[in-house]
């Protein structure tokens, strides 16, 4: 019985350690909060419609520039990610509440936020 209990405690500890891989560090959060697209019009749209979720770790949205949050999504392909941005998915509202974003804007913003991540 003690052996089983010890193994269970060890397993829970290991799970706790591995879960932190997807948790952004303070530097990741600072980078997400400071990042802006180089295009001024796109930067304005990002600040207005994307940052409230994608620069806040507790929002549940993938953090801008944080590779572990984007790899699984990028594996689905950019077209699928842009479709999810346009139509909405789970807590993501349709168009990210950027009603004046064109399809090209949505693609550019998605590419910007997922930059650095590779499938």
Which residues fall in each region the model found?
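Bacterial N-terminal signal peptides that target proteins for export
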Residues: 1-7
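Bacterial signal peptide processing site
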Residues: 17-21
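Electrostatic cytochrome c docking/interface patches
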Residues: 22-45, 59-68
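Extracytoplasmic/secreted proteins, especially bacterial periplasmic and envelope-associated proteins
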Residues: 41, 45, 69, 80, ...
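The canonical Cys-X-X-Cys-His
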Residues: 46-56, 109, 113
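Gly/Gly-Pro-rich "capping" loops immediately C-terminal to redox-active cysteine motifs
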Residues: 55-83
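Axial heme c-ligation environment in periplasmic c-type cytochrome domains
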Residues: 61, 84-117
């Amino acid at each position: 019985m003690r052996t089983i209990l010890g193994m269970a405690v060890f397993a829970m500890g290991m799970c706790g350690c591995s879960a932190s891989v997807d948790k952004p560090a303070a530097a990741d959060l600072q980078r997400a909060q400071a990042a802006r697209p180089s295009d001024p019009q796109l930067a304005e749209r990002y600040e207005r419609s994307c940052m409230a979720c994608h620069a806040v770790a507790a929002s549940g949205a993938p953090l801008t520039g944080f590779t572990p949050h984007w790899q699984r999504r990028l594996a689905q392909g950019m077209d699928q990610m842009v479709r999810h941005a346009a139509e909405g998915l789970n807590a993501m509202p349709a168009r990210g509440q950027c009603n004046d974003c064109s399809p090209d804007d949505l693609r550019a913003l998605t590419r910007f936020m997922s930059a650095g991540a590779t499938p």
